[in-house]
Swiss-Prot record:
Pathway noted in the entry: Cofactor biosynthesis; (R)-pantothenate biosynthesis; (R)-pantothenate from (R)-pantoate and beta-alanine: step 1/1
Pfam families listed in its UniProt record: Pantoate_ligase
Function comment: Catalyzes the condensation of pantoate with beta-alanine in an ATP-dependent reaction via a pantoyl-adenylate intermediate.
Gene Ontology molecular functions: ATP binding; pantoate-beta-alanine ligase activity
Originating gene: panC
Any one of the GO BP annotations: pantothenate biosynthetic process
Binding-site residues, (R)-pantoate: Q61, Q155
The name this protein goes by in its record: Pantothenate synthetase
Keywords (A to Z) from UniProt: ATP-binding, Cytoplasm, Ligase, Nucleotide-binding, Pantothenate biosynthesis
Length: 286
């Protein structure tokens, strides 16, 4: 497995693969990899001939009071896990390689309304940072296919919109959320949880499951369900950020009669901000 830090070296490697007619896949990450990240590589491997994973803690997607400086860097362990999954190259550039004119002066990719709801409210500018770095990676790797986890549903929809709006020739795949045995969605930030908080943490998913069960049973008073769910989270010890039943396509508030839904939630538990979702496809005619 090759380890690359310079964009020129990455471009040269991909150009060699292209000359051989090989199909290239990309798994973008920020490192500190867990089994969910490694599962992304395993998921994508059958869909390409060569697989690149990027490891880059992107300062542009962190707010001023967020955990950019303290975000764990575990490059050696990450590379060992990726190599064991058959990844062909790891691209881990320093910040100055990705933002040569400095982060503040960097050109940005603004997404619009889709990025201004849910996580976009409490993390203003976050999805601008995500969209910008992903477009840069797409330009550098020019992958045929890339994969993102469905746990970060809003991020997946943002990337899908960017690819569509900017006519980027890449197939975007969303991989189902990888969970711990007790249902907690795997996340790098789970490492911030204390032992007691870790015991509480699966309550976010259980709350979403309860809401989804009611919706499948025909309850379409979504605002009441949201209020009840937020109260349940608070009772368990969470500090809810949002808990909403949304249209799956544009993440606007769902209304009775909508069929494609996502029940999405974010909540603080100690130092960890946890997010999760459940996607629903309803058939109200039954």
């Amino acid at each position: 497995m090759k380890r690359l830090k310079r964009t020129a070296d990455l471009r040269a490697l991909v150009a060699d693969w292209r000359r051989e007619g090989l199909r290239v896949g990309l798994v973008p990450t920020m490192g500190n990899l867990h089994e969910g990240h490694l599962a992304l590589a395993e998921y994508l491997a059958p869909h390409c001939d060569r697989l690149v994973t990027s490891i880059f803690v992107n300062p542009l997607q962190f707010g001023p009071n967020e955990d950019y400086e303290s975000y764990p860097r575990t490059f050696g362990e990450d590379c060992a896990g990726l190599e064991a999954r058959g990844v062909d190259a790891v691209f881990a550039p320093p910040v100055e390689e990705m933002y040569r004119g400095g982060v503040r002066q960097a050109t940005r990719v603004e997404v619009g309304a889709l990025a201004e709801r849910l996580c976009g409210i409490s993390r203003p500018g976050h999805f601008t940072g995500v969209a910008t770095v992903v477009v840069k990676l797409f330009n550098l790797v020019q992958p045929d296919v890339a994969v993102f986890g469905r746990k970060d549903y809003q991020q997946l929809r943002v990337i899908e919109q960017v690819v569509s709006d900017l006519n980027i020739p890449v197939e975007v795949r969303g991989m189902p959320t990888v969970r711990e045995p007790d249902g907690l969605a795997m996340s790098s930030r789970n490492g911030y949880l204390t032992q007691q908080e870790r015991h509480i943490a699966p309550g976010l998913y259980r709350t979403l499951q309860g809401m989804a069960k009611r919706i499948r049973a025909g309850d379409d008073d979504y605002r009441r369900l949201e209020a009840r769910g937020r109260a349940m989270l608070a009772e368990q010890g969470f500090q809810p950020d949002y808990l909403e039943v949304c249209r799956a396509d544009d993440l606007t508030p769902a209304a009775p009669g909508d069929r494609g839904l996502v029940v999405a939630g974010a909540a603080w538990l100690g130092r960890a901000r946890l997010i999760d979702n459940i996607e629903l496809e309803l058939n109200r005619d039954q």
